[in-house]
């Protein structure tokens, strides 16, 4: 049954206007980053992959850190893996610029966190508390150089990720465009992160 005074063409017009209004209103409240489509990159370089618990992902990561010449940038949700922490500390001691952005809540609530130990050994540590979880697991080694390396995957830098969980880690070399995208994201988080203690 039609409402009095509204013809079908008026109803269609009003429905169309409402649809346009709702669509443009939603776009107005959408963060600008959502409007930018994710980039598509050409595959290049090499990729090493490790799966846990069957493979030594911690060694793969530590070996990559051992090869760092100038810089290691890290984003970590949780950090309890001693071998990886030791590799970062050793890199710092040999003059490599090492910066870690960690999730504040995880750092404060996990008694076995190695963040304080790394900070006490000269690693520059920053806390990211701008998100429900700072859940990135990323390392950028020598970004901007020919040997730039990106490490990422589900693998938290933890003992549990190595010995208890089913995880994966990718070590990618020779894809500067991909490293640059991750570096841009790392810098976005670094801008709002706060120094540890």
Segment roles from a protein language model:
Residues 63, 67-124:
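Primarily the HKD phosphodiesterase
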Residues 29-54:
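N-terminal low-complexity, Pro/Thr/Ser-rich intrinsically disordered segments
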Residues 23-25:
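N-terminal signal peptide c-region/cleavage motif recognized by signal peptidases
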Residues 2-17:
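Bacterial N-terminal signal peptides that target proteins for export
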Residues 57-60, 64-71, 178-182:
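DNA replication sliding-clamp ring fold and its partner-interaction surfaces
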Residues 48-50, 73-76, 99-103, 126-127, ...:
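Structural recognition of the beta-strand scaffold that forms the well-ordered cores
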């Amino acid at each position: 049954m039609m409402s009095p005074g509204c013809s079908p063409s008026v109803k269609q017009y009003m429905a169309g206007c409402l649809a346009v209004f709702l669509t443009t209103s939603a776009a107005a409240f959408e963060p600008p980053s959502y409007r930018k489509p994710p980039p598509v990159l050409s595959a290049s370089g090499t990729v090493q992959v490790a799966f846990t618990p069957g493979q030594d992902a911690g060694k793969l990561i530590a070996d990559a850190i051992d090869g760092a010449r100038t810089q290691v940038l890290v984003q970590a949700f949780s950090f309890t893996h001693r071998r990886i922490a030791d590799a970062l500390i050793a890199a710092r001691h040999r003059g490599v610029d090492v910066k870690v952005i960690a999730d504040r809540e995880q750092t404060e609530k996990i008694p076995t966190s190695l963040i304080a130990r790394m900070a006490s050994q000269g690693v520059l540590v920053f806390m990211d508390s701008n998100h429900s979880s700072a859940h990135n697991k990323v390392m950028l080694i020598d970004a901007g150089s020919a040997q730039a390396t990106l490490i990422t995957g589900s693998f938290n830098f933890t003992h549990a990720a190595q010995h208890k969980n089913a995880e994966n880690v990718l070590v990618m070399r020779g894809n500067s465009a991909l490293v640059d995208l991750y570096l841009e994201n790392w810098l976005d988080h670094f801008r709002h992160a706060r120094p540890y203690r």
